[in-house]
């Protein structure tokens, strides 16, 4: 077995890819692979966002965010949300996603996603060049991919295969936007 120092985070992939919605006046959507469950009671999750990201400033400003769960049918929008900058242009004009009113937070949810987890920030942890935003899940809406609150693995959830343009799903297929 080789031992060398490289980008060690590559060894954690593939990871599920989510859409993070932030902002109220001018909502923004970004992709994030670094989303993690943190607690059952209270229900908490964490999302690590780089300090330089526009989404970082929006979450700091409003204290809320939505974690949306896309399937592979949304891959082109997932790719655009992760490669365009909301600070430089209105991403929503480039995406074919529909923002809908959330139930418990001011930040909108995404109609086309199979689940939307509405979160209020309860803690921020500085972790080098990222902030781990700890969000209490206040409400969840879901589609058919989560009947009875459990994921249906017949739905192809987006997974980032590695840094870059390779994606996969919970199947063995590989996809590119």
From Swiss-Prot:
Domain of life from the UniProt record: Archaea
SUPFAM superfamilies: FMN-binding split barrel (SSF50475)
This protein's UniProt keywords: Flavoprotein, FMN
Pfam families assigned: Flavin_Reduct (PF01613)
Single Gene Ontology MF annotation: FMN binding
InterPro entries: Flavin_Rdtase-like_dom, Flavoredoxin, Split_barrel_FMN-bd
Cofactor(s) the record lists: FMN
Flavoprotein among keywords: yes
Coiled-coil ranges per UniProt: none
Family indicated by similarity: Belongs to the flavoredoxin family.
Descriptive protein name: Uncharacterized protein AF_1786
Native source species: Archaeoglobus fulgidus (strain ATCC 49558 / DSM 4304 / JCM 9628 / NBRC 100126 / VC-16)
Lineage: Archaea, Methanobacteriati, Methanobacteriota, Archaeoglobi, Archaeoglobales
């Amino acid at each position: 077995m080789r031992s060398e120092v490289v980008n060690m985070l590559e060894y954690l992939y593939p990871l599920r890819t989510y859409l993070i919605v932030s902002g109220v006046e001018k909502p923004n959507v970004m992709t994030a692979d670094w989303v993690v469950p943190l607690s059952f009671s209270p229900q908490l999750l964490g999302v690590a966002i780089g300090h330089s990201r526009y989404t970082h400033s929006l979450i700091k400003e409003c204290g809320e965010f939505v974690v949306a769960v896309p399937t592979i049918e949304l891959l082109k929008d997932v790719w655009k949300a992760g490669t365009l900058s909301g600070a430089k242009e209105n991403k929503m004009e480039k995406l074919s996603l529909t923002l809908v009113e959330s139930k418990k937070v001011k930040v909108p949810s995404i109609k086309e996603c199979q689940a939307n987890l509405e979160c209020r920030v309860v803690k921020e942890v500085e972790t080098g060049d990222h902030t781990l935003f700890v969000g209490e899940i206040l409400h969840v809406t879901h589609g058919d991919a989560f009947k009875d609150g459990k994921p249906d693995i017949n739905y192809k959830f987006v997974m980032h295969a590695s840094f870059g343009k390779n994606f996969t799903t919970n199947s063995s297929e590989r996809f590119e936007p």
